[in-house]
Regions:
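Glycan-processing catalytic domains of CAZymes
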Residues: 1-178
């Protein structure tokens, strides 16, 4: 509710200093992690201060277990002091230079090979996030968002299989949202 009354420029001021640290290009990994932890703590505090109820954290997973930008969400998972609820949003499309207006230049191809082995490997990676007490639930089910489910071959079969794996892992049901 508190965010409703902020203008764009006020919101930009609130978040601006957090976005200015160039932690991706830092060579010193320990220093980068320290800075990330500080930023994550500040974002957590600001989110609660301004009435944000949780975060949807982007998750990038490609065939053959290729991931990008995984460390920030893993650090979030490891830091229980960041006490804001979260869910993961699988950005499940081909990675191209779309942000530069060049969606023809493919950086990482997303193929969605429809095998239970690949689905299980992906699920096993996600399981610690699903087990986390901060995971957002809807009607008692763990929320997992998929950006473009229609791109996944045999998506219905995959979702049924993940639900089965979730029950076997003892975490209950999954709530899928697109």
């Amino acid at each position: 509710d508190r965010l409703d009354n902020l203008t764009y420029n006020e919101l930009k001021t609130v978040m601006g200093t957090l976005a200015q640290a160039d932690i991706i290009n830092m060579e010193d990994g320990a220093k980068r992690n320290d800075i990330y932890e500080g930023i994550a703590t500040d974002v957590n505090t600001l989110a609660k201060q301004y009435g944000i109820g949780g975060f949807a954290i982007y998750h990038y997973w490609f065939d053959d277990n290729v991931q990008i930008l995984e460390r920030p969400k893993e650090m979030f998972l490891e830091n229980k002091d960041l006490d804001i609820p979260f869910c993961l949003t699988w950005a499940n499309e081909t990675w191209a230079r779309r942000w530069e207006g060049n969606d023809k230049e493919v950086l990482l191809l997303q193929t969605h090979t429809p095998t239970k082995e690949k689905w299980k490997t992906h699920f096993d990676y996600l399981l610690p996030f699903f087990k986390d007490e901060r995971a957002i639930r809807i009607d008692g089910k763990i929320l997992f968002q998929i950006y473009r489910p229609h791109l996944i071959d045999k998506v219905g079969e995959m979702l049924r299989y993940w639900r089965e794996l979730a029950r076997e892992a003892g975490i209950g049901e999954l709530y899928f949202m697109a």
